[in-house]
Design a protein with these regions (language model features):
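Activity-critical C-terminal alpha-helical subdomain
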Residues: 418-490
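Switch/communication elements of ASCE P-loop NTPase nucleotide-binding domains
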Residues: 1-47, 222-343, 362, 516
Length: 520
């Protein structure tokens, strides 16, 4: 099984949140979306300690603008089978015996654990654990604590950068233990690196070695893991790393144990190259991984379907991620390449301006500066769609909760893009709210006929032999003799000389609509 979903109501900094997890999940979002509260909900309940966690007053959410906390909070954990009919396995018999598995339409059974907290009239705090049936009602179970402990033992949560991993005697043993072979030496190097980068104990610096050599050993281990067809090496690494974790009578690392590892902003401590090595290493472990990050480098290594974007609103925290049905295989492949290699930073934006090519990217960027519009501060990103296609990008933006607006040329291709936008619009949404179609064949011709012909003539080094000026030929030569960025800067400089009133009205309206969408 793996953790499939978590519902949070009234816990710490989260008023409401419903989030779907996959075996490997990366969470991104602006500050204050509730990251610490979400990670705490996971690590406190599945804490691998001997006692079930009991809520305290600080766990109850205080709504915005109020001084009093809510009186009731709920955490609902949904676990899902990895394989159909997993309930037949020996290790699931206790859950089957109490009829805790619930059928689901997708054929994979679910297990629901609800943890509730309540403040009574005497200000006493009560915590209740229960398993739910298909109707959401608590299943009567006499040995509820024992069943909850068994679930925690299967899926203990370990939070890297967490004080519970701060165990200097483990670190000391790692350094002084006898190394028998190259493989054990490489595994030990990985363990030392984890201690060095993710433990915050004052004595950790005493155990560090040459980290360059350690990372080299970790990289060698990656190559061996990739060739490990029997998975024996993966298991050896897993059980070696298990020595870093808390041990008690309930936690026994076996073939059915699947810990949930929380990596909290690993990029904050690691160089991008080191992030890549560590990321590949942990991908071989039989764990469920949940990572928070603001790293473009890390995002570029993650499958699009594993990225979840979280946005906090006044009433709740919304989670957005790509569904398996949102894109076909070809669109997914093209979009993945485009995002990973060119536009990872765009995933951290709340608004996309989708344009056909490089020229539009440069010109719109320069126009925004002249209008004193800081696109980065506004969360706006200009994204070129020529490589991946317009429709997949709009689909992805909608799935991830990113607002979007399209700028296209006035040629046949532009009219086709207009039809794509029309199909993607929600009912009753005017086409003009999502797209601007230039009244000329492209943006260069638009500027040429709107008072900036002299810029193109100058850049083209055009020597007039008559009063005839072939517009298209001059534009082509201007681009050939300079570059698209240089053309954009030249137009920007000319507009700066004339004043912002010379910016064509169509672009002022475009930015006005974009800002309106970005602030909704």
């Amino acid at each position: 099984m793996y953790l499939r979903q978590l519902e949070v109501v009234g816990f710490r900094g989260i008023n409401r949140l419903s989030i779907h997890f996959r075996p490997d999940m990366v969470l991104i979002g602006e500050n204050m979306w509730g990251k610490s509260s979400l990670l705490s909900a996971l690590s406190l309940i599945f804490n691998a300690e001997q006692d079930l966690y009991q809520f305290t007053l600080t766990d109850f959410h205080i709504p915005t603008g109020q001084s009093q906390s809510v009186r009731h909070l709920t955490l609902l954990f949904t676990f899902c089978e990895n394989d159909k009919r997993e309930d037949n396995e020996e290790y699931n018999k206790p859950y089957v015996h109490h009829n805790l598995f619930v059928n689901h339409l997708d054929g994979y059974q679910r297990l629901y654990l609800r943890v509730e907290g309540e403040i009574d009239s005497q200000q006493n705090i009560h915590t209740e654990y229960s398993f739910l049936d298909e109707n959401g009602d608590a299943v009567p179970v006499e040995n509820i604590n024992e069943l909850v402990f068994s679930l925690i033992a299967r899926h203990p949560v370990y939070r890297f950068r967490d004080a519970r991993l701060n165990r200097p005697h483990y670190a000391f043993n790692l350094v002084t233990s006898k190394v028998n072979d190259d493989l054990q030496d490489e595994i030990q190097a990985v363990m030392i690196l984890l201690c060095h980068y993710f433990l915050s104990h004052k004595n950790v610096s005493d155990i560090t070695q040459d980290t360059t050599l350690l990372w080299h050993k970790a990289k060698l281990l990656c190559f061996k893991l990739k060739q490990d067809e029997t998975h024996r090496l993966r298991k050896k690494l897993f059980f070696s790393l298990a020595s870093l974790f808390i041990k008690n009578k309930y936690i026994h690392f076996g073939r059915f144990t699947r810990p949930i590892i929380l990596f909290e902003d690993p990029d904050a401590r690691l160089h991008p190259r080191m992030v890549a090595i560590m990321w590949e290493l942990v991908s071989y472990l039989p764990v469920q991984r949940i990572t928070t990050t603001n790293s473009v480098e890390l995002i570029s290594q993650v499958q699009l379907g594993s990225i979840c974007r979280l946005v906090r609103t006044s009433e709740k925290t919304k989670s957005f991620q790509l569904s398996r049905r949102d894109l076909n295989k070809e669109d997914f492949r093209r979009l993945s390449f485009h995002i990973h290699h060119n536009r990872s930073l765009a995933l951290f934006s709340s608004m996309w301006i989708l344009v056909e090519g490089e020229t539009e990217v440069w010109i719109l960027s320069e126009l925004a500066k002249l209008l004193e519009l800081n696109l980065d501060m506004e969360g706006i990103r200009i994204v070129e769609f020529a490589q991946s296609g317009l429709k997949p990008l709009i689909k992805y933006a909608k799935a991830m909760g990113i607002e979007w607006y399209v700028l296209v040329d006035g040629d046949d291709a532009g009219r086709n893009y207009r039809d794509v936008v029309r199909i993607m619009l929600d009912d009753n949404t005017p086409l003009t709210e999502r797209i601007t179609i230039l009244p000329k064949r492209d943006i260069e011709h638009f500027f040429y006929v709107n008072g900036f012909a002299d810029v193109f003539i100058r850049l083209a080094h055009w020597e007039a032999k008559s009063t005839y000026y072939p517009m298209t030929k001059i534009i082509q030569r201007a681009i050939q003799r300079t570059s698209k960025p240089d053309l954009a800067i030249a137009l920007s400089n000319e507009i700066a000389k004339r004043g912002t009133q010379s910016i064509p009205l169509v672009f002022k309206r475009l930015f006005s609509k974009v800002l309106s969408l970005a602030h909704t």
